[in-house]
């Protein structure tokens, strides 16, 4: 069933016309099918022509026979849940009416059950005024739908009720049972849930009597079928718990939200006003959890081990305990982990019912402790737990925002105490069930509570006020599926929801103070739930997370530290651009290159972060970067790798058997360990097709792989290739650091020598010089440049100009994927490699001579900046999710220096230098040229 409560009456009428048309078509189709046996004698042909095969296949696949028209028709009867204001107005209106209407004052049916008492429609007599009170929306629609619904039911293929088969009165209960229920004054709408709650407690007989008296009148409002015998309302799944009418009267004057200090003399727990606004698809999931929590005592006692397992599963998915001022709790049943405390009522949390949670539910402890059960590391609490006696109550409901000390007292992993007093005796059955299994539960919970860490040690950066806004990601995923999500999914959702800090290459900064801070911190950011919450907190001024680049609060002149600028000019991998260099992440039209502002910004060349990207990045991304660039980071290359290669003629495959590595460099200097993996290429195939990788072996310098990497390739082609094996460290943010490589020339390899098929140790080496590629295979680019000085005299700020780059077309681009090519051009003004400064053209496919005719504009240029900057134009072949580098240009003065520091990207050729000089000398004039594309080689760091 779908949620159509938002539709207006006009829209509902339009849909009803469509449904009526559908019913008419069904009648015509049924008439045609009825006459088919007279014309068609073959059973198989008759089955195909009548459409019977389709309904049988659908029933086998979906296990039901519900039709789309029925789903829409029933969904339109769904009633929008009332909010607090509407419900209070309805109470006042009903109080002025007859006693019959006042009986229903607290029987607020959920939208999933709306209209149940009026089924079946085709047998319903004209509704009485009292029945319209139960569901005014559905009775208004029934008049226009009655004839349509009668004719829409196919006699040959009866359709089941979309709610549930148990809702039809004739499915499971005999007529005798219905009459007995009518005599007793109890309808099926409430009987199931009442029996589930009161089956084990004799003290609840008074409550049952009150409910029976209350429900005698609603029974009379149910219209009987035309045959004359009384009917019982269909029995829904036991999802909600109905309370006594006295509760709402008492709570009308109480503060909202409900206080935790409800006394034991309270007659009943009020129903939560704000219900879960979910579609009916989540109704089944709530029903499942309802059955888990409120099964009969005898069944639960016999399955003690099952209870233990269920609570263990819940423990990994429970969030922090809801705050006192939240309207409704989370959906989970919470038990106390303390052995000297019996678990309180599991049916009520904060005096509300199971299955509800507030629309305004807030993750109040966003900066507090997370569930330590989700982590792989054990954090021991050096101090005795402060939660052995439960959390203190909040005695005031007038202050919606708790104090800082109250915020810093969440329940930790494994202990979920229920501290509020039981507000009713209605749920003693559940408490009895919990008590009998408390030994097993408490043992499990106590062992789990040892994993928790003192929250006082974690909340050093807690903000003074916690958020009142609901956590959409956690709430939505609670609404969704029938099963609780796994701990892995919870970690992924939290890590995706929080703001991910930027991470740079390890030890890239020359600032020794930052390195000292790095060494004093834990590393496993993702695997620790404690660090998950720390990522949401404001960072401590005395420490920083390893690998997270910190920016000084005061602007730092980038020229005061030439050594830093040298390091920035060193080759670093393109994973600072998310490694894939996807086109979707680039800025297509922004072109603000404010050099004067850039030189004074904290995110200048002195700050190497993944967002600013102020490094000498090559234009080769991802896989190609590992082939055509220098060393990544400043990790020492050492150790060796053991592998063997063989060509299997029968399979026409090259097999690379990677055995192990030893004595690798430690990417984590403090713990002296790395997370290495091996990556292989067949050069010069630089794309994804030529790359193979092993699994990542965690926390070792001597990894053992024993994996075979296979290449499907002809032997003659293989003899023209080179095999490149490189070892990489993969950190927790999935960024790579180079640990060494080995390269074999397969052209001179002796494939017949058996010694070459044996495992051998090869020492790891630094990156070799990139493979030279023929310039004539790169193609050419036709472009024009123009420098426009800013003609705005009289401004206080120095005037700045613009550089216009007109990319016209490319000629004779190489084909790396056979006959397929989908090229585009990307432009960057070095030394700024941030995403905001990058622009690109559209992709032109199916041609080696693409015409772009795209102009890119960069502003903020002063005359002196023209001698220090360089325009980098790169051509890419876009294929699925990857971009393959084709060639590029670097247009500048080619001095090898930028702002007084030697850099490797200032390597323009004579033709490129000539074009740049003409542009500078001839402002406001387009300077055209056709330049050959080249492989942008990355030089080593300058000393």
Swiss-Prot record:
Q: Compositional bias (Low complexity) spans? A: 125-138, 603-613
List the Gene Ontology MF annotations in alphabetical order: neurexin family protein binding; small GTPase binding
Q: Where in the cell is it found?
A: Cell membrane
Please give the InterPro entries that the UniProt record associates with this protein.
Answer: C2_dom, C2_domain_sf, FYVE_2, Rab_BD, SYTL1-5_C2B
Occurrences of domain RabBD (ranges): 1-57
- Describe the task this protein carries out: May act as a RAB27A effector protein and play a role in cytotoxic granule exocytosis in lymphocytes.
Query: What is this protein called in UniProt?
Result: Synaptotagmin-like protein 2
Instruction: Tell me the organism.
Output: Bos taurus (Bovine)
């Amino acid at each position: 069933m779908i949620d159509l409560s938002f539709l207006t009456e006009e829209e509902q009428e339009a849909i009803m016309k469509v449904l009526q048309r559908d019913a008419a078509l069904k009648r015509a189709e049924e008439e045609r099918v009825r006459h088919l046996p007279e014309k068609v004698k073959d059973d198989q042909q008759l089955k195909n022509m009548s459409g019977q095969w389709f309904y049988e296949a659908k029933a086998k696949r979906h296990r039901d026979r519900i039709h789309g028209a029925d789903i829409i028709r029933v969904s339109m009867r769904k009633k929008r849940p009332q909010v607090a204001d509407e419900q209070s107005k309805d109470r006042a209106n009903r109080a002025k009416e007859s006693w019959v209407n006042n009986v229903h004052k607290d029987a607020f049916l959920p939208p999933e059950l709306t209209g149940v008492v009026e089924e079946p429609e085709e047998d319903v007599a004209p509704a009485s005024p009292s029945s319209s009170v139960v569901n005014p929306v559905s009775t208004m629609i029934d008049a226009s739908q009655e004839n349509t619904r009668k004719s829409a039911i196919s006699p040959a293929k009866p359709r089941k009720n979309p709610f549930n088969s148990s809702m039809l009165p004739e499915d499971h209960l005999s007529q005798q049972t219905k009459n007995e229920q009518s005599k007793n004054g109890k309808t099926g709408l409430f009987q199931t849930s009442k029996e589930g709650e009161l089956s084990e407690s004799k003290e609840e007989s008074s409550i049952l009597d009150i409910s029976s008296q209350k429900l005698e009148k609603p029974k009379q409002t149910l219209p009987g079928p035309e045959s004359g015998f009384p009917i019982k309302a269909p029995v829904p799944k036991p999802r909600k718990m109905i309370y006594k009418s006295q509760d709402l009267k008492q709570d009308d004057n109480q503060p909202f939200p409900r206080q935790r200090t409800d006394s034991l003399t309270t007659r009943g727990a009020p129903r939560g006003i704000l219900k879960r606004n979910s579609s009916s698809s989540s109704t089944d999931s709530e029903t499942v959890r309802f059955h888990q929590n409120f099964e009969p005592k005898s069944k639960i006692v016999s399955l003690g081990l099952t209870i233990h397992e269920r609570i263990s599963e819940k423990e990994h998915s429970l969030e922090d305990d809801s705050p006192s001022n939240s309207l409704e709790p989370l959906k989970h049943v919470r038990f106390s982990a303390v052995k000297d405390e019996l678990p309180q009522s599991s049916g009520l949390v904060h005096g509300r019912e199971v299955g509800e949670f507030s629309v305004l539910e807030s993750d109040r402890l966003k900066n507090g402790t997370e569930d330590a059960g989700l982590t792989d590391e054990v954090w021991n609490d050096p101090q005795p737990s402060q939660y052995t006696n439960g959390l203190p109550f909040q005695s005031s409901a007038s202050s919606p925002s708790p104090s800082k000390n109250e915020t810093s007292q969440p329940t930790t992993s494994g202990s979920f105490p229920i501290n509020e007093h039981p507000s009713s005796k209605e749920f003693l059955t559940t408490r009895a069930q919990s008590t009998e299994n408390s030994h097993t539960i408490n043992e499990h919970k106590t062992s789990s509570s040892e994993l928790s860490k003192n929250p006082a040690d974690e909340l050093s950066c807690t903000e003074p006020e916690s958020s009142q806004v609901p956590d959409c990601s956690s709430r939505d995923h609670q609404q969704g599926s029938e099963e609780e999500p796994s701990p892995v999914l919870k970690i992924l959702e939290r890590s995706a929801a929080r703001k991910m800090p930027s991470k740079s290459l390890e030890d890239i900064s020359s600032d020794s103070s930052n390195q000292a801070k790095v060494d004093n911190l834990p590393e496993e950011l993702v695997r620790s739930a404690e660090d998950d919450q720390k990522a949401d907190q404001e960072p401590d001024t005395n420490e920083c997370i390893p690998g997270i680049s910190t920016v000084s609060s005061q602007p730092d002149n980038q020229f005061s530290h030439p050594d830093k600028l040298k390091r920035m000019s060193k080759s670093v991998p393109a994973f600072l651009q998310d490694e894939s260099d996807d086109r979707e992440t680039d800025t297509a039209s922004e072109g603000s290159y404010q050099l004067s502002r850039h030189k004074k910004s904290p995110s200048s060349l002195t700050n190497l972060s993944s967002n600013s990207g102020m490094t000498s990045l090559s234009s080769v991304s991802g896989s190609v970067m590992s082939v055509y660039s220098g060393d990544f980071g400043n990790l020492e290359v050492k150790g060796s790798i053991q592998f063997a290669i063989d060509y299997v003629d029968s399979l026409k495959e090259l097999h690379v058997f990677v055995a192990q590595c030893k004595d690798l460099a430690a990417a984590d200097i403090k713990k002296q360990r790395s997370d290495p993996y091996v990556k292989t290429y067949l050069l010069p195939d630089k794309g994804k097709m030529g790359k193979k990788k092993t699994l990542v072996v965690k926390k070792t310098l001597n990894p053992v792989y024993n994996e075979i990497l296979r290449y499907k390739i002809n032997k003659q082609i293989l003899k023209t290739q080179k095999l490149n094996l490189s070892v990489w460290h993969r950190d927790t943010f999935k960024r790579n650091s180079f640990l060494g490589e080995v390269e074999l020339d397969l052209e001179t390899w002796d494939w017949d020598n058996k010694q070459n098929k044996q495992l051998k140790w090869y020492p790891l080496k630094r990156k070799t010089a990139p493979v030279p590629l023929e310039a004539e295979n790169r193609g050419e680019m036709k472009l024009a440049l123009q420098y426009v000085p800013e003609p705005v005299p009289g401004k206080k700020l120095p005037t700045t100009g613009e550089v216009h780059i007109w990319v016209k077309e490319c000629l004779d681009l190489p084909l790396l994927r056979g006959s397929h090519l989908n090229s585009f051009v990307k432009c960057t003004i070095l030394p700024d490699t941030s995403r905001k400064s990058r622009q690109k053209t559209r992709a032109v496919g199916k041609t080696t001579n693409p015409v772009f005719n795209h102009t890119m504009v960069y502003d903020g240029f002063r005359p002196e900046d023209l001698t220090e900057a360089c325009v980098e134009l790169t051509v890419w072949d876009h294929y699925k999710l990857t971009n393959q580098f084709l060639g590029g240009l670097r247009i500048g003065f080619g001095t090898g220096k930028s702002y007084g520091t030697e850099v490797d990207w200032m390597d323009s050729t004579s033709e490129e230098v000539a074009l740049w000089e003409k542009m500078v000398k001839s402002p406001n004039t387009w300077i055209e040229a056709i330049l050959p594309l080249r492989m942008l080689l990355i030089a080593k760091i300058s000393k």
